[in-house]
């Protein structure tokens, strides 16, 4: 996959470990996210995804659990035809502590997956299923297997 680094000294996405699904995205600049505020953080890169694939920007679990930092739109979707700079919309859920980002900090992860380009066919009635129209909470909270 090709990547364009948009500033000198930029950061090509990398996986921390061989088996990782996500490639770390790093901040191209410093930033401060105030408590209960959101901010667009640029990565300084653009990528060319192959047709039939999309990139999904996901939160980093350590930032979420240790600092309350997550994504406003999770996941953020990068379509195969998009060639602009990848930006990440972060939110600081902490009520009191500002979050400081340094240039090069890992701020999110990019997971690349194949996508199905489906077509929709309008029908009068959908076929039945075991679940039917049961919605939120329909499977229960507790394990009932025995």
Curated annotation (Swiss-Prot):
Sorted UniProt keywords: Hydrolase, Magnesium, Metal-binding, Nucleotide metabolism
Superkingdom field: Bacteria
Signal peptide start-end: none
Catalytic activity line of the entry: dUTP + H2O = dUMP + diphosphate + H(+)
Gene Ontology biological-process entries: dUMP biosynthetic process; dUTP catabolic process
Pfam name, any one: dUTPase
Pathway annotation: Pyrimidine metabolism; dUMP biosynthesis; dUMP from dCTP (dUTP route): step 2/2
Chain positions recorded as substrate binding sites: 60-62, 73, 77-79
The protein's Enzyme Commission number: 3.6.1.23
InterPro entries per the UniProt record, alphabetical: dUTPase, dUTPase-like, dUTPase-like_sf, dUTPase_trimeric
Cofactor: Mg(2+)
Class of the enzyme per the UniProt entry, highest EC level: hydrolase
Entry keyword Glycosyltransferase: no
UniProt keyword Chaperone, yes or no: no
GO molecular function, one term: dUTP diphosphatase activity
Coiled-coil features, chain-numbered ranges: none
Protein function: This enzyme is involved in nucleotide metabolism: it produces dUMP, the immediate precursor of thymidine nucleotides and it decreases the intracellular concentration of dUTP so that uracil cannot be incorporated into DNA.
Family recorded in the similarity comment: Belongs to the dUTPase family.
Protein name, as recorded: Deoxyuridine 5'-triphosphate nucleotidohydrolase
